[in-house]
Amino acid sequence: MIELDAVSVAVPASASTPAASPGAEPASARRRWGRTDHGTPEEITILHPTTLSLTERSVAVIGANGSGKSTLARLLNGLVLPTRGYVRVHGLDTHDDGRAVRRMVGFVFSDAEAQLVMPTPREDVALSVRRTGVERSLRAERVEEVLGSVGLAHLADVSVHALSGGQKQLLALAGVLATEPRVLVFDEPTTLLDLRWRTHVTALLGRLEQQVVHVTHDLDTALLADRVLVVDHGRVVADGTPEASVAAYRELMATRVGTTDEP
């Protein structure tokens, strides 16, 4: 269970580059005048006060570029800490219990290469497996199992640098799955995958027992979730069934680009 209690995220307007702050999305920022808790005369609000209780197994977050959706995702494992309010994951506060939350919440970035630190897929997943405390005699089997689940078993010993962008994203996903987190958060994990692999990964996510939260531009993927949030200019403007939220998102986009097609 994930709870956001009156959570907001802001950066000082005097900062030379707001985007330098983790999760900041200046394209969506709105300036709010008046002193903050820290005495700053003004600040750029990235995410306006948000209260949510996420209990569904699968939650999708959709929105235009710069809407604040990635900031919302990064709040869930403490990559971004709220300026105000509280984020709790299974009862643990991301500020007070940050290390425990990060062990509990696996995160797959859109830039998967940043998560890959070992020379080969086998070694990269093995590193994650070791961190879980799996007995030495069972580690090799677990590595094979995880690589097989994402379709990379046949590439276990090739150089990571030889993998395609899509394969690197699959490897990053494998590394996170190997840690056996209770919650999985994905920030556009299928961006570089072709239709075949996107279908494969989507089916894999549907079989997982963990709670899954994913930021996506793919409305077909969003429709497979149990609940969909629409984020716009740092606010959750729709929250409900996949069909209702996707319809609200299409209508929102239509008012801006004059079409119901995905931008």
Residue spans for each PLM region:
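Conserved ABC ATPase "signature" region
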Residues: 32, 137-155
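Helix-to-loop junction immediately C-terminal to a conserved catalytic motif
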Residues: 77
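The feature captures the beta-strand-to-loop junction immediately N-terminal to the Walker
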Residues: 62-64
